[in-house]
Structure formats: structure tokens, C-alpha cells
């Protein structure tokens, strides 16, 4: 099962909504899901305003329907990387402030999500490392052949939401509609994401139960095999 994170030889599909998403069969993804109240409206509005000002300074209007294409055509690869890194950093900083109800701070919501993620491992995906933060989730996963990320995402966000809501006796929207995914390009990126997942609670200054974090042995083995080859 030690498939490479990304292959230059295989086809890549790209589509856009609020974010740009890359897809490739057999690849590994870093994914972030956020609880519906994880980011207060004033923070998301400020974040979007800062993005708009940053792009406007580079001659790109975020009001344009094609602004993401403009980013790719007008900015160098390095500028694109730095832009995305900076605004992802700002967003994650706000997430780590633990806004909202923070259902995953304690059981039963935390245990329900963790158990279901592990239960579906190797039937719907190959589950890599994960960290269940109080109001968001970071995880690495590799898709089983024939399954795409959209269907897998729908199962995690839809089916898991039902179980978590049931466990904590609530109803209504659990997750934010938009989510973040990144197709892991190489072993260096994979190591960086694994380190980020492991270090997230300490850097955020949040103490979590042990079962909030999981390190996947198959990823460790895959990296070891990669270094030996």
C-alpha cells in the first residue's frame, strides 16, 4: 500500500470553489475540517478583507469571478506559495484560539469522531496521522482505489456529523461547508504535515486527551521505504 504521495506521471484534476483543489488517484491528502462556529464572522470577514487588499496591491481583484486564475497567471510560483502560506497561517492561528463550542475538547464527541475515523480505516480510506483539536480536525489520508475525495469527504462530514450530534444530544449544522485539502507533493511535504499535526496542540497551548492524536505506522513505514529506495 506504500503508494507515492504524488506522481508527476499521473493525471491531475483541478477544480475551484472558494479554494483551489487538486485531485490525483492514489495520492495522499492533508485535510482540515472546521466546526461551524470555529471562526466568528468578524474574523472571517477580516481575513477575507486582508486577502483582498493583499491581492489588490498586486493588481488582482478578488471581486472578479476569475480571481484564482488571475493569481496563477499574474503571480510567480514563489509568490503564490507565500500568499497561500501566509493566509493559511493566519487562519490556523485563529482556529487555535479555540473559538466556539469546541465540541471535540472532551468526550463523548471526541471519542465518537475518533472511533468512527478508525472504524472506516481501510474500508473507505487509508487513515494517516490525525489530531482532533477542540474546534477543528487535521488529518492525512490516502484514498482507496475507485473512491474519490468528494465522496469520502461527504461521508466524513455527513455521516460523522449525525453520530457526533447524536452523542452530544444536539441537532443542526456541525461542520463549516468549506474545508481545506492539500495534495501532498513529496516526502518532504508529508514529513512537514506530520510534524504540524503532532505539534499543533503544544503550539496552540492546548492540553488534549491522548486519543486526540494518532500516528499512523503505515506512513512511518512508507517514509522509511522511500528513504531506502
Where are these regions (language model features)?
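Short catalytic/metal-binding and nucleic-acid-binding patches
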Residues: 1-229
Amino acid at each position: 500500500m506504500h503508494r507515492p504521495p504524488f506522481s508527476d506521471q499521473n493525471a491531475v484534476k483541478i477544480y475551484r470553489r472558494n479554494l483551489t483543489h487538486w485531485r490525483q488517484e492514489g495520492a495522499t491528502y492533508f485535510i482540515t475540517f472546521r466546526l461551524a462556529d470555529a471562526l466568528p464572522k468578524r474574523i472571517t470577514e477580516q481575513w477575507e478583507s486582508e486577502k483582498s487588499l493583499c491581492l489588490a496591491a498586486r493588481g488582482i481583484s478578488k471581486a472578479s469571478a476569475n480571481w484564482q486564475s488571475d493569481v496563477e497567471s499574474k503571480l510567480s510560483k514563489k509568490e503564490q506559495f507565500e500568499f497561500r502560506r501566509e493566509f493559511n497561517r493566519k487562519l490556523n492561528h485563529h482556529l487555535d484560539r479555540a473559538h466556539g463550542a469546541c465540541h471535540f475538547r472532551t468526550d463523548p464527541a471526541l471519542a465518537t469522531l475518533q472511533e468512527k475515523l478508525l472504524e472506516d480505516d481501510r474500508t473507505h480510506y487509508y487513515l494517516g496521522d490525525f489530531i482532533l483539536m477542540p474546534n477543528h480536525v487535521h488529518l492525512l489520508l490516502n484514498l482507496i482505489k475507485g473512491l474519490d475525495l468528494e465522496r469520502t469527504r461527504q461521508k466524513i462530514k455527513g455521516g460523522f456529523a449525525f453520530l457526533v450530534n447524536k452523542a452530544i444530544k444536539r441537532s443542526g449544522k456541525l461542520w463549516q461547508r468549506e474545508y481545506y485539502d492539500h495534495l501532498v507533493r513529496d516526502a518532504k511535504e508529508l514529513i512537514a504535515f506530520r510534524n504540524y499535526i503532532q505539534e499543533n496542540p503544544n503550539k496552540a497551548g492546548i492540553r488534549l486527551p491522548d486519543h486526540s492524536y494518532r500516528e499512523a505506522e503505515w506512513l512511518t513505514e512508507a517514509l522509511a521505504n522511500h528513504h531506502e529506495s
